[in-house]
C-alpha cells in the first residue's frame, strides 16, 4: 500500500471527477477535496438551513482504483460515440461519389477504423444507397476487418431499409466476385428485403439457394420466407415450412406465429389461423400486439364477431395496449357483421383517443348504419366527417350514397334530397347507387312523378341502368297504384325491354298465363344469380297486388323449376312443413295458396295427413319496419280462419294438427282458401 507521503508527492495533476455518490450524505454541505489544497478552515458542523452553496461537487479519485478506470472508459466511449455519429452524418451529407465519400470518411477516421466502427457507421447513416455501397468499399480497404461478410450484411440491411432490391442484388454479385462466403444473416436480410419490396417470388428463390451455400435457415429466415410463400400464393409450402420448423424443435415466437396466422387468413383457412393462435399460447408463447391484431383481422374476415370480442377481452386482460391497427381490425369485424353497438363503441373510443379515421373506415360505418337503420348514429358520423380538418376524412361519393340509402329506406324524402343537394355542391355527380336509392325513396313515399324525374336524371348523366336498378323499379311498381303504374312501367321498358315485356304481360288482365310463363323463364334463366330471387319476389308481389293469383302461381312454378326457391316444402312421417323464410309477402302468400291446394288435393286423393303441419316464416323483422313476415302471416291466417297458431316454443313457426287442418280444408273450397 502506498504511503501518505508518496501520495502527496505524486507528480501528476490531480484528477477532479464529478459523480453522484452511491450513498450521499444527508448533509446539504458540498465538498471540494484535493490533496493539493490546504486544509479547510473549521466551520460549523450544522450550518444554517438558510445558507446554500452553488459550488459543484468534486471528489478526488485514486487513479489506481477500478473506479478511475471505469470513469475513463465512459469518457472515452462517449467521445467515440460522438465521433461515429459525426462520421455517419458526414456520410449522409456528402455526394454519392467515390471521392466525396472517401474524403468524408478519411476526415472522420485519421486512424484506421475498427470493424465495429464500420458496422456502426453503415448501420446508422441515412446516406443514399450508392453512398452506402461506396462507404462499404472504403471500409473494406481501410478498416481492420476480420469478417468481411459482416460489413456486407450491414450494407444489405441498409438497402433493405430503403427498399432497393436491384442494389441489393448487385451487392450480392459483388460479394460473390470478391470471394466472400454469405452466411445465414446474409440470406435472412436478402429474403426480407425481397419481401419488403413486394417481391415474394424473389424471396422464395433466394430461400431455395441457401443449401447451395451450406446455410440452414434459422427462425427469422423461416418467418420471412413463410410470409413470402404465403404472399406468393403458395400457402401449402408456407405451412409445410412451419411444420418443419416445429419438427426441428425451433422455439415458437410471436413473429413466426403472426406470419402463419396471416398465411392461413389469406388462404381462407380461418380455423387454421385460430388454431395457431391457441397453439402458441399452449406452448407458453405470450402473444404480442402484432399477433393479436393479426388474429383479430383474420376473425373479422371470417365474419366471426363473437370470437373477435373474446380475443379483444383477452388482449385487454393481458394489459396489452391497443393501437390504431387494433381498433381498425375491430371496426372491420363489427361493421362487416353489422354489430352496430360494438362498432359504435369502438368508433367513440377512437374519437376520444383522437385517432385518425380515414374515409374508408367512415364509409364502412355509414354503410353499416344504412343497412341496420342507425339514423342518429349515421348523422353523427357524417357530421364528424364534415367537421374533420383532415382531407382524408372528408365525405366522398360513397359517403353521400350511404346517407341517401339510409334516408331512402326510412322514407325520409327531405333528408335524401338534402344529402343529394350537398353532394352536388361538394362537386360530386350522383351515381347509379344514389339514384337507385332516391327512386326507392320516392316510391315508398308514393311520389311517382319524382320517380320518373329521377329516372330522367339517370339518362341525362349517361348512366346505363343495371339489374339492381331494374329491381328497384320493380319494387316501386309493386307498390304503385294501378292508375299510375303505367309511368313506372315506362321507366322499366327504357331500362330493360325484356323485363318491361314480362311486366306488361303480368299487368294485362286479358293476357293468358302461358306467355308470361315462357317470357319469365327466359328472363330469369338469363339473369344473374344475385338478382333472380329479388326479381321473382317483386313480380309475385305485383301479381298479388293486382289480384292476378293465377299468374303469381305461374311465376312460382318458373322459380321452382329454375331452382330459385328450393326446399319450400318438406315432408316427414310426422310433419309436413312450408318454408317461407326469405320470401316477400306476395311470394309467401302465393306459396301458401299452392300448398293449401296441394293439401286439399291430397285429401281428395285419400292420402293421410301427418300428425303435425307447420309454416315457417322466420322471426326476423324488416330493418326499417316493425312488421316482419311472421306478423303479416299471423294477420292473414286469422283472416282465413285457418287453424295455424304461433308455436310458443318455436319462434317463427305456425303449427296445427292434422285433425284441425282436415276439418278446415273440408269446409273450404280450394279456390276460397286464400283471400288476397
From Swiss-Prot:
InterPro entries: Pentatricopeptide_rpt (IPR002885), PROP1-like_PPR_dom (IPR033443), Smr_dom (IPR002625), TPR-like_helical_dom_sf (IPR011990). One of its GO terms (molecular function) is mRNA binding. The keyword Ribonucleoprotein does not apply. Residues 578-662 form the Smr domain. Its main location: plastid. Pfam families: PPR_1, PPR_2, PPR_long. Residues 17-58 are annotated as: Disordered. One of its GO terms (cellular component) is chloroplast stroma. PPR repeats lie at residues 148-182, 183-217, 218-252, 253-287, 288-322, 323-353, 358-388, 396-430, 431-465, 532-566. It is found in: Plastid, Chloroplast. Involved in translation and accumulation of chloroplast ATP synthase subunits. This is Pentatricopeptide repeat-containing protein ATP4 homolog, chloroplastic. It comes from Oryza sativa subsp. japonica.
